[in-house]
């Protein structure tokens, strides 16, 4: 199989591991910087060039598209899809996952539970919007933030109103959620490949913080996801159309709640914490996708 990995940095752990796993299973692999891919779109067909040369015959594309290049990266991926390449995470599915509000709407439509979420635009509606959310603490999230960035905890209603006013003054898109205190700064990252959770780890926020993301200083240990948690993770991935993703859950008094779905989950933290060869599981999965 001729496999392309869309990644801006060939030295990243996740990219290197996917290359190693693919080559170990006999596949031809090439790393492509999405920003060096450019395309021709016409009624007579689609074509892709990379650094001055045409890209043809690609069977499978594994996207490792960072949030900062979501629009261009998904356009490149879509072009490969239109040229007949397969992918575990289609361009439209990635776009769904990167828009937190849209993702939550799609999950809720499938009956998947999450922290209560509110969204509004007009400053005149702020007081009523917060009443729909319930008493503080509140969590404010930028709609397209990643790795724990753009997430704020407010302890008082006045602070929530102040943050809302400030973000609206910056024309930022954001949503607000209830704070789940019983989680105590911990969440569960379930790594979904195909129809199953292949590894899971508990991430714990550092002292004085509530964000458990590893990029925000959180720590991780292997953790067993319950059957219910695994089912929620797989259902969430399917709701967005993803077959390789990280689903972040919190354990609450009313059961597992979905926080976020990451369509480009890192491999380093989960492989180190769990001792699972996640990269090979991904390659085995895309082999099945390629079969007629």
Swiss-Prot record:
Residues 104-287 form the ATP-grasp domain. Mn(2+) 1 binds at residues 248, 260. Belongs to the RimK family. This is Probable alpha-L-glutamate ligase. It is an enzyme of class 6 (ligase). Keywords: ATP-binding, Ligase, Magnesium, Manganese, Metal-binding, Nucleotide-binding, Protein biosynthesis. GO terms for cellular component: cytoplasm. ATP binds at residues 141, 178-179, 187, 211-213. Mg(2+) 2 binds at residues 260, 262. Its cofactor is Mg(2+); Mn(2+). Binds 2 magnesium or manganese ions per subunit. Mg(2+) 1 binds at residues 248, 260. GO terms for biological process: protein modification process; SOS response; translation. Mn(2+) 2 binds at residues 260, 262. The keyword tRNA processing does not apply. It comes from the Bacteria.
């Amino acid at each position: 199989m001729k496999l392309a990995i869309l990644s801006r940095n060939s030295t990243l752990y996740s990219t290197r591991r996917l290359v190693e796993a693919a080559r170990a299973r006999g596949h031809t692999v090439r790393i492509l910087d999405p920003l060096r891919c450019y395309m021709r779109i016409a009624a007579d067909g689609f074509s892709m060039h990379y650094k001055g040369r045409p890209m043809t015959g690609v069977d499978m594309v594994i996207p490792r598209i960072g949030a900062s290049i979501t629009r261009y990266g998904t356009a490149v991926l879509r072009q490969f899809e239109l040229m007949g390449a397969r992918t575990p995470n289609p361009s439209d599915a990635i776009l769904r996952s990167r828009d937190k509000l849209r993702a939550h709407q799609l999950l809720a439509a499938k009956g998947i539970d999450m922290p209560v979420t509110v969204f509004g635009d007009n400053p005149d509606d702020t007081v009523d919007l917060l009443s729909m959310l319930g008493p503080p603490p509140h969590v404010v999230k930028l709609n397209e933030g990643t790795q724990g960035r753009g997430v704020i905890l407010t302890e008082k209603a006045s602070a929530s109103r102040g943050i809302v006013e400030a973000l609206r003054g910056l024309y930022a898109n954001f949503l607000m959620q209830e704070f789940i205190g019983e989680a105590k700064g911990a969440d569960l990252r379930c790594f979904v490949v195909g129809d199953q959770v292949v590894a899971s780890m508990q991430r714990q926020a550092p002292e004085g913080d509530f964000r458990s993301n590893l990029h925000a200083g959180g720590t991780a240990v292997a953790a067993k996801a319950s059957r219910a948690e695994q089912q929620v993770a797989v259902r969430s991935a399917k709701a967005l159309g993803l077959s390789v993703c990280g689903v972040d859950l919190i354990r609450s008094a009313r059961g597992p709640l979905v926080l976020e779905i990451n369509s480009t989950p890192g491999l380093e933290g989960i492989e180190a914490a769990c001792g699972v060869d996640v990269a090979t599981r991904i390659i085995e999965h895309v082999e099945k996708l390629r079969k007629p």
